A protein has these predicted regions:
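Donor nucleotide-sugar binding/catalytic pocket of nucleotide-sugar-dependent glycosyltransferases
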Residues: 34, 138-178, 185, 193, ...
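Conserved acidic donor-binding segment of nucleotide-sugar-dependent glycosyltransferases
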Residues: 102, 307-318, 326-332
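Short hydrophobic beta-strand element within catalytic cores of glycosyltransferases
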Residues: 285-295
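A short, histidine- and acid-enriched strand-loop-helix "catalytic/donor-clamping" loop
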Residues: 8-11, 95-97, 105, 109-127, ...
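Nucleotide-sugar-dependent
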Residues: 197, 267-284, 302-303
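A short, well-ordered alpha-helix in the C-terminal region of glycosyltransferases
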Residues: 319, 326, 333-348, 357-360, ...
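Conserved donor-binding/catalytic core segment of Leloir-type glycosyltransferases
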Residues: 4, 182-211, 220
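Nucleotide-activated donor-binding/catalytic signature segment of Leloir-type glycosyltransferases, i.e.
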Residues: 232-253, 264
Length: 377
């Protein structure tokens, strides 16, 4: 079975382990097209050729780079004519121009098509995106949703085709694993890891909650963005500047080592009218490293963590503080949550598991399965 995937996300080296895992299914002949760079608001994301065994990774230019709704691959028609895939996996939202154009061009070579969506809030888009969305939902063969809320959104918006709930990427458990040992005398180390430092990630709440902790502790904050100056100012105002380290953007290759130094990882996301946490990938990466995780009850966070971590109400500084205090004072609690977290990742969130479920979708598409159920992890 020939599968062609379009994915700007697969620029990231660690994400490419999913592609290798798909390619390990011997019946799949996989080709993936990525751009050389994506101009994200947080900064340019350049292609990392980190995991490229078993499949073809092609690099094609895109037009309107950085424009989420209007970018597209101008060479796709030629690629489709040359490869003639059985399945075109469009790793993109259904209301974007890239998806609409890819679907239209795939029909020329009779390829089955699927889209991927994280969209966990119902939004109504202006013309022409509402028209693009309507046509994609009517003509696409399959939908993969990154979370249960996205599945519900697209059913509400009229998508009647088959779908599955499968996270976009899992974790390579061989890369993200516990450190050989943690120095018990180094004090309690807390971490926050977001690519962008923006208000909805709740890092200010974490600073305030941590400032109440007694004893010896440190806080590492990964990421960069418009809120960094105000967060640095807040750390000074709280009198904890010497305990807080702003580490900037941590690359995917650096992330395993970054997480392994932590005792606890916090994702303090807060829901906004136009956004709520779609998944929280850093949670499963930390869990794989046997780091205790603490998350706000925003969006998908509670479903990702399950019983393998601690949950607190959004914006509840004292609840977050008490979770951190309990973790700080109990190595047993940290160890138990760490072990439970890694086991949860091994059961549900490895790249191998995600790849297996994705390949099963490809087979359903080719076999013209009529299954229209929603399944969750």
């Amino acid at each position: 079975m020939k599968v062609l995937m379009l994915s700007k996300a697969c620029l990231v080296g660690s994400y490419q382990t999913k592609l290798e895992a798909i390619a390990q299914h011997k019946e799949i002949d996989l080709t993936v097209i990525v751009p050389p760079v994506w101009h994200d608001p947080a900064g340019a994301v350049k292609l990392e050729r980190a995991h490229t065994e078993g499949y073809r990774l092609l690099v094609d230019p895109i037009r309107f780079n950085g424009q989420f709704h209007t970018y597209y691959f101008p060479k796709l028609r030629q690629r489709l004519a040359a490869i003639r895939p059985d399945v075109l996996h469009i790793d993109e939202e259904p209301y974007n121009l890239a998806t609409w154009l890819a679907l239209r061009q795939a029909r020329r070579v009779q390829a089955k098509t699927l889209f991927f969506s994280w969209q966990n809030l119902r939004r109504e888009y202006p013309f022409p995106f509402n028209l693009l969305e309507k046509q994609v939902l009517a003509k696409i063969d399959f939908g993969i949703m990154g979370n249960q809320a996205a599945a519900e959104v697209w059913r509400q918006k009229g998508y009647g085709g088959p779908l599955r709930v499968i996270p976009q990427f899992g974790v390579d458990a061989a890369l993200f694993q516990p450190p050989a040992q943690r120095d018990p005398g180094r004090g309690f180390v807390i971490g926050s890891a977001n690519r962008r430092l923006v208000p909805e990630k709740g890092v200010d709440l974490l600073l305030r909650a941590a400032a109440r902790l007694p004893g010896v502790w440190r806080l590492h904050i990964a990421g960069d963005g418009p809120e960094r100056p105000s967060l640095e100012k807040l750390a000074r105002q709280l009198g904890i500047w010497e305990r807080v380290q702003f580490d900037g953007v941590v690359t995917s290759a650096q992330m395993p080592g970054y997480l392994q130094q932590l005792d606890a990882l916090v994702l303090a996301s807060r829901t906004l009218p136009n956004w709520k946490e779609q998944f929280g990938r850093v949670l499963i990466e930390a869990m794989a490293c046997e780091v205790a995780v603490v998350g706000a009850n925003s969006g998908e966070i509670p479903n990702v963590i399950g019983e393998a971590g601690l949950i607190f109400p959004e914006n509840d500084e004292m609840a977050l503080h008490h979770h951190l205090l309990n973790l700080m004072q109990s190595a047993t609690l940290r160890d138990d949550l760490g072990a439970n977290g890694r086991q949860r990742v091994l059961n549900h969130y490895t790249q191998s598991q995600i790849a297996h479920e994705t390949v099963a979708v490809y087979h359903k598409m080719i076999n013209n399965a009529s299954d229209k159920t929603i399944s969750a992890n």
